[in-house]
């Protein structure tokens, strides 16, 4: 499983953003081209290995949207997008996030206390976005049933788990070594 995803990751270019090694990939960046076969592999993996006994799928703008869309179409479960701009709706929750290469505000709408959710994201790397979103979800008092990242880079998973006490799982684990993506394993190999 995940053979197309793994192959595409190994072939992904790596660019430097300051001291941060940033791999450029369709699932994490939307470029150069998001092919349906890889997106389907991702949706199949999350629906197979994730706990889908939820009311809502939650994703973060922008690169979680295509993952949540594919997953929603596959499962029939609606999704909520954590957005980068405020809509000023009643109950909107603002979240400050800081990653290895940016920082800013995120806004959560459409969730209520007691909602059972799965949080899906493209990548967990520095943990900044996921930590901020998980803390906000806890404050809203949703039931965080599962957290799945398509890609786990470096120690991001451990950083998030240490900061939030929430278990994070990923489909594929990788590191960037000497400017190249190296696959370290996948959830179906565990």
Swiss-Prot record:
Record GO terms (molecular function): guanine phosphoribosyltransferase activity; hypoxanthine phosphoribosyltransferase activity
Class in the EC hierarchy, top level: transferase
GO cellular component: cytoplasm
Reactions performed catalytically: IMP + diphosphate = hypoxanthine + 5-phospho-alpha-D-ribose 1-diphosphate; GMP + diphosphate = guanine + 5-phospho-alpha-D-ribose 1-diphosphate
Pathway: Purine metabolism; IMP biosynthesis via salvage pathway; IMP from hypoxanthine: step 1/1
Nucleotide-binding in keyword set: no
Keywords linked to the UniProt accession: Cytoplasm, Glycosyltransferase, Purine salvage, Transferase
InterPro entries associated with the record: HGPRTase-like (IPR026597), PRibTrfase_dom (IPR000836), PRTase-like (IPR029057), Pur/Pyrimidine_PRTase (IPR050118)
Superkingdom as given in the UniProt entry: Archaea
One family name in Pfam for this protein: Pribosyltran
Cytoplasm found in the keyword field: yes
Quaternary structure, from the entry: Homodimer.
Annotated family: Belongs to the purine/pyrimidine phosphoribosyltransferase family. Archaeal HPRT subfamily.
HAMAP family referenced in this protein's UniProt entry, alphabetically: Hypx_phosphoribosyltr (MF_01467)
Function description: Catalyzes a salvage reaction resulting in the formation of IMP that is energically less costly than de novo synthesis.
Protein name: Hypoxanthine/guanine phosphoribosyltransferase
UniProt source species: Methanobacterium paludis (strain DSM 25820 / JCM 18151 / SWAN1)
Lineage: Archaea, Methanobacteriati, Methanobacteriota, Methanomada group, Methanobacteria
